[in-house]
């Protein structure tokens, strides 16, 4: 009945608009111009084929020289200049979309100084994990809560309003709101505009926008989301022509020259801010500089630059020139450099002046015939070029030409962790950067108005997951702190100080965070937290959420890939799971014979590359100079990750371990991660690594190598306690029959446990 009444009212208004158009002698085209609509839109409104927005009716009344009441009601409504009464449930509905209902409480009152609205805002779980959409309009706004809870953001400040609470703010300040507390929120909004108030003002203020933002990268990326903003599918377009430095960095600089690209702190916390224009010009100078040194397309150039801001100038310059960037950590020693220089045929290196790194390079140089150019950053040294002084002498323009690198040309190489042998060289094309759009947009939850902080140092692949490609594809800024040693108490105050909105760190650092008293720090600016690098123990997840209210969204990928599995924005997550497969990757779990395993059974995570999707943007091109190793992991249309997981009935994946790490005991296949997670629940355990130990009867048994917290003594009684705890909290056959206490666990340079040395 109510729907029918409203429909009849709108039909009557549409008929009066048509009548008045004929009386005034306007054509549909003229009225479309008067109401700022297209002719097609105007015709639909007048014919009653579409709901009539209040703004449209208001503009029609102005064009006809009528009061809006005359047009809406068909009478003069003179009394509406002194007062108006709106009975319960009788307000004029002006918007009902995206979980929002807005009713104007005084639609016919003349010469209003403000617009009062009755607003119902549905609770949306997905909205709890996204940044609040912010908007502006002229004047001021007053909101009072009638029922439920409303989370309101005004500028950088956030308030939770309960029943009876109210807020008044300048609506020219960016603001937005969502319902919280698990149920809908009903409130009264009064919009006081500097100009004539209309329905459009409150819609822009109150109705939340969709999650999609218009990015320049949409020439190359097409995403489809559901009504909650969850990613359904994503395709890449024009990827064969793509070059991140030209098509993203330079394009943003051209359109938004003053937009912040990076906020950088050096080790002394000296702050520098770089716009996209700064990055564009500095990378052009770097490209011209490298070219003058004889570096050319296809040359391999190593970057050992910690978190120095010059890293961004250099890598973008190499991307423009076509030389292949090879990031590496400053922890390398002589033999590490010697192996890498020769394995990749490194011809030039940009190296930090900090510490002993340059000396280690010089020691390795004598056995590295391909290395001809050494460039120092942050200092000077005999036999080295000085980057900071020399690159500034070159032009800040570097034109794109017909032979500029793009698409399938090699852009980047990473050395793998080397947990089972010498590190391999994973080679990536220019399409790799596009693959990280999902990483940033749907996992990190990066938006153009935010600042993202990924902890990782630039020598690791994870740094480029979170400090460059995806974040700038989303036109967001990155925060970089060039610290030497991780200290939770040093980093935690930075979130509030620099209004960091999204954050990513490995599980180890979250473990360090939860050992701090987090109540001492203001972490309210953080909208979203993520982790990757190793599986996250559920206990760490629970403790971090208990102390901060933030859930940690886990993701999975490799040096050879972009994000392949993850807990994405808009989807519910299960604590301890890896999440679901990313739409751009066709994932399958297989047994040792390559057959797909049923749900609930362990299988190796593989990526199909022989389907219509082909090789996805983000998957590596192969191991450089190592065809045999490439064929070993990539054959019969499958790329084998060597990681084992199982999938539940809802499609979530659960990590078991590396294929080489799975323990085979008495016919059981036991993943080390599950046992490690249980042992890590014990308050006196600092670190734990589970591995296989040979056994004459069972073939293998579970061995737990444990590092205790300072002050805790490892005893036989403690071993028994740990064994009994595992028996109680998981299947008894999985308990560690061998428990050893160690001062530290053997790890790779990247910090991953080397299980075959336990």
Question: What spans do the regions from the language model cover?
Answer:
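Conserved AMP-binding A3 loop
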Residues: 272-277, 411-435
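Conserved pre-ATP/AMP-binding loop-to-beta segment of ANL
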Residues: 257-260, 375-376, 381-383, 392-415, ...
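AMP-binding/adenylate-forming catalytic core of the ANL superfamily
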Residues: 332-335, 339, 349-354, 503, ...
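Conserved AMP-binding/adenylation subdomain of ANL enzymes
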Residues: 434-454, 458-501, 516
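Gly/Ser/Thr-rich phosphate-binding loop
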Residues: 473, 500-505, 514-574, 586
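Conserved ATP/PPi-binding loop(s) of AMP-dependent carboxylate-activating enzymes
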Residues: 581-584, 595-632, 670, 713
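Conserved AMP-binding/adenylate-forming core of the ANL superfamily
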Residues: 258-316, 333-338, 389-392, 430-431
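Structural core segment of the AMP-binding/adenylate-forming
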Residues: 207-213, 320-389, 710
């Amino acid at each position: 009945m109510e729907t029918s009444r409203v429909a009849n009212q709108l039909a009557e208004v549409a008929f009066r608009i048509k009548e008045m158009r004929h009386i005034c002698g306007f054509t549909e085209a003229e009225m479309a111009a008067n109401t700022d609509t297209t002719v097609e839109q105007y015709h639909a409104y007048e014919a009653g084929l579409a709901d009539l927005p209040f703004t449209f009716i208001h503009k029609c009344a102005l064009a006809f020289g009528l009061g809006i009441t005359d047009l809406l009601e068909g009478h003069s409504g003179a009394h509406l200049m002194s007062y108006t009464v709106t009975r319960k449930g009788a307000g004029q509905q002006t918007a009902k979309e995206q979980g929002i209902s807005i009713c104007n409480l005084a639609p016919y009152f003349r010469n209003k100084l403000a617009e009062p609205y009755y607003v119902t805002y549905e609770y949306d779980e997905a909205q709890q994990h996204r940044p609040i959409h912010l908007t502006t309009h002229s004047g001021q706004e007053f909101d009072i809560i009638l029922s439920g809870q409303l989370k309101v953001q005004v500028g950088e400040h956030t308030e939770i309003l309960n029943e009876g609470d109210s807020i008044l703010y300048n609506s020219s300040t960016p603001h937005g709101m969502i319902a919280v507390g698990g149920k809908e929120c009903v409130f009264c909004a009064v919009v006081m505009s500097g100009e004539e108030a209309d329905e459009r003002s409150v819609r822009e203020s109150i109705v939340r926008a969709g999650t999609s933002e218009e990015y320049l990268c949409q020439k190359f990326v097409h995403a489809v989301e559901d009504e909650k903003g969850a990613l359904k599918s994503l395709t890449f377009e024009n990827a064969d022509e793509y070059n991140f430095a030209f098509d993203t960095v330079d394009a943003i600089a051209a359109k938004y020259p003053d937009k912040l690209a990076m906020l950088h702190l050096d080790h002394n916390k000296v702050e520098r801010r770089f716009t996209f224009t700064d990055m564009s010009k500095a990378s052009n100078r770097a490209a011209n500089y490298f070219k003058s040194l004889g570096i050319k397309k296809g040359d391999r150039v190593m970057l050992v630059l910690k978190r120095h801001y010059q890293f961004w100038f250099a890598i973008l310059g190499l991307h423009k020139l076509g030389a292949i960037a090879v990031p590496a950590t400053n922890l390398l020693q002589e033999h590490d450099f010697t192996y890498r220089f020769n394995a990749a045929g490194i011809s030039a290196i940009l190296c930090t002046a900090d510490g002993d790194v340059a000396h280690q390079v010089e020691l390795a140089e004598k056995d590295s015939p391909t290395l001809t150019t050494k460039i120092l950053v942050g200092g000077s040294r005999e036999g080295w070029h000085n980057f900071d002084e020399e690159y500034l002498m070159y032009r800040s323009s570097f034109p794109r030409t017909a032979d500029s690198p793009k698409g399938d040309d090699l852009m980047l190489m990473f050395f793998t962790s080397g947990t089972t042998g010498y590190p391999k060289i994973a080679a990536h094309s220019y399409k790799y950067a596009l693959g990280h759009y999902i990483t940033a947009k749907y996992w990190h939850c990066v938006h153009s108005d935010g600042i993202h902080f990924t902890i990782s140092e630039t020598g690791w692949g994870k740094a480029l997951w979170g400090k460059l490609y995806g974040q700038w594809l989303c036109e967001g800024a990155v925060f970089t702190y060039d610290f030497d040693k991780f200290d939770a108490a040093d980093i935690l105050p930075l979130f509030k100080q620099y209004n960091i909105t999204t954050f990513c760190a490995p599980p180890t650092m979250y473990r360090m965070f939860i050992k701090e008293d987090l109540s001492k720090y203001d972490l309210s600016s953080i909208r979203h937290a993520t982790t990757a690098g190793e599986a996250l123990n559920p206990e760490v997840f629970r403790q971090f959420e208990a102390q901060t209210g933030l859930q940690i969204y886990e993701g999975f990928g490799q040096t050879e890939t972009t994000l392949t599995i993850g807990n994405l924005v808009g989807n519910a997550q299960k604590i301890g799971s890896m999440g679901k497969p990313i739409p751009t990757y066709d994932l399958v779990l297989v047994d040792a014979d390559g057959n797909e395993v049923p749900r609930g059974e362990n299988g190796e995570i593989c990526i199909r590359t022989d389907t219509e999707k082909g090789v996805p943007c983000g998957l590596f091109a192969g191991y450089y100079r190592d065809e045999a190793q490439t064929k070993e992991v990539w054959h019969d249309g499958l790329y084998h990750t060597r990681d084992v997981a199982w999938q539940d009935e809802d499609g979530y994946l659960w990590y078991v371990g590396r294929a080489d790490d799975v323990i085979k005991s008495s016919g059981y296949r036991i993943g080390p991660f599950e046992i490690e997670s249980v042992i890590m629940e014990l308050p006196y355990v600092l670190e734990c690594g589970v591995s296989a130990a040979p056994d004459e009867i069972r073939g293998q048994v579970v061995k737990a190598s444990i590092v205790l917290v300072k002050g805790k003594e490892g005893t036989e009684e403690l071993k028994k306690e740990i064994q009994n705890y595992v028996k109680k909290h998981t299947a008894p056959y999985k308990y560690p029959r061998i428990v050893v206490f160690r001062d530290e666990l053997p790890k790779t340079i990247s910090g991953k446990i080397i299980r075959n040395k336990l």
